[in-house]
């Protein structure tokens, strides 16, 4: 039994230490959120299309030569940047992202040829691939019990930065009557400031895959053999250790877990939604500003529309967290309904030649997509570990990028069909329409099977009737570190489609 004096002395030692850790954590959170906010302040981003057209680039060059370079280069750099992000422990990739933004705006301001603008797209693809570094970085520095709060803080900072940036850009153009060139110079100033901030970020000591702690890795069978060697011969023990290392390596275990979890219908469904819907979504955002320009070149409320769509996206994604339905039964029908709404909005965009209709339909289109993003995130993560969740999101992002690259090559690139922007939107309308019909048919078949049984389907998971928000709150109490344990509160390593990427949405809209 510990003497009372020693207990009091230990408590007196622990209390200042805990206060110091709490103060340090708060300072770190504030600095990270401030960096996330400042990194989004690029008010000229919503007006890049008018700027390019003022620089005497034609609509055909922007549509069929400049923009297609973005998905091509994004596909090329996505996997290397993803691996470097974890291997270098996040901070160097955040600095690289800021440097790439500097190169983007220098080329935008100083470039004079299509090749310069294509090179600008290459640098911007690096910034798109590096977005995962911020969302991964903030979770590597805090205890798992603070994941939920960190997700909300960082997400709020990013959304606020996107909203303020769009409002500021629109105000400077409409009220201040400044030129788009000056607006891009202001953006470059903000980017340089965010670059300075990135240099003072704290570098984590661990990461998710390559720099895992000893406790997270655990003792492998070969390590146990070394501690308790058997009577076998040295050569046999060495061979067994090598085979055990390969068999029980972290990557092999993750892949085996992925194959096992791929049998879950809900996981397959939402991964398919992520790949196919996000591809169409980003194709729309790539080219929507060109569509606006071709509809009415006298009005330019790009910043206001971006701000409104960001606000609506935040509202719809937040409200989705409180939606409580039986997802095993209704997922396909909800997805089909939302995609049908998206298809009708895309139809209105290219068919009704009114700029205000184009503005409103795009705001609604973006809000509809962001409504399903948090639902998909929690449905995918509901039975996956933190590491496996990151791997699945990475695979989904890669497949979505590959799909939109193929569509771009066929539809947009001058080496393919080279369609004008309005004809492209017809293709995208057919794309969403076919997705909707497929999901409705899929839901109908499930409904027929359900009716034939004449009884309720058993719930696949205990949290089926809960909302994603309730699911994530429950997951906070789960143990962090077991590869097989469900951890839906895992870091939101959303590469391109979650709310962490909202700034990227505005950029590709502006570039389009």
Curated annotation (Swiss-Prot):
- What outcome is documented for mutating residue 48 to F in this protein? Induces resistance to 5,10-dideazatetrahydrofolate
Q: Which GO terms describe its biological process?
A: female pregnancy; folate import across plasma membrane; folate transmembrane transport; methotrexate transport; positive regulation of cGAS/STING signaling pathway; response to toxic substance; response to xenobiotic stimulus; xenobiotic transmembrane transport
Q: Which residues lie on this side of the membrane: Cytoplasmic?
A: 1-29, 86-89, 138-151, 201-266, 324-329, 378-391, 449-512
Query: Extracellular face: residue ranges?
Result: 51-62, 111-114, 177-181, 293-300, 351-353, 416-423
Q: Kindly list the GO CC terms recorded for this protein.
A: apical plasma membrane; basolateral plasma membrane; brush border membrane
In which organism is this protein found? Mus musculus
Concerning SUPFAM superfamilies, the annotation shows: MFS general substrate transporter
According to its UniProt record, which protein family does this protein belong to?
A: Belongs to the reduced folate carrier (RFC) transporter (TC 2.A.48) family.
Looking at the keywords, is Zinc present?
no
Q: Where do the segments described as Required for substrate-binding lie?
A: 400-412
Taxonomic lineage is: Eukaryota, Metazoa, Chordata, Craniata, Vertebrata
For this chain, one GO molecular function annotation is:
folic acid binding
UniProt: folate binding residues: 48-49, 121, 131, 162, 281-282, 286, 366, 370
Q: Name one Pfam family in it.
A: Folate_carrier
InterPro entries named among the record's database cross-references: Folate_carrier, MFS_trans_sf, SLC19A1
> What role is this protein assigned?
Antiporter that mediates the import of reduced folates, driven by the export of organic anions. Also acts as an importer of immunoreactive cyclic dinucleotides, but with a lower transporter activity. Mechanistically, acts as a secondary active transporter, which exports intracellular organic anions down their concentration gradients to facilitate the uptake of its substrates. Has high affinity for N5-methyltetrahydrofolate, the predominant circulating form of folate. Also mediates the import of antifolate drug methotrexate.
Please report the name of this protein according to its UniProt entry: Reduced folate transporter
Segments spanning the bilayer are 30-50, 63-85, 90-110, 115-137, 152-176, 182-200, 267-292, 301-323, 330-350, 354-377, 392-415, 424-448
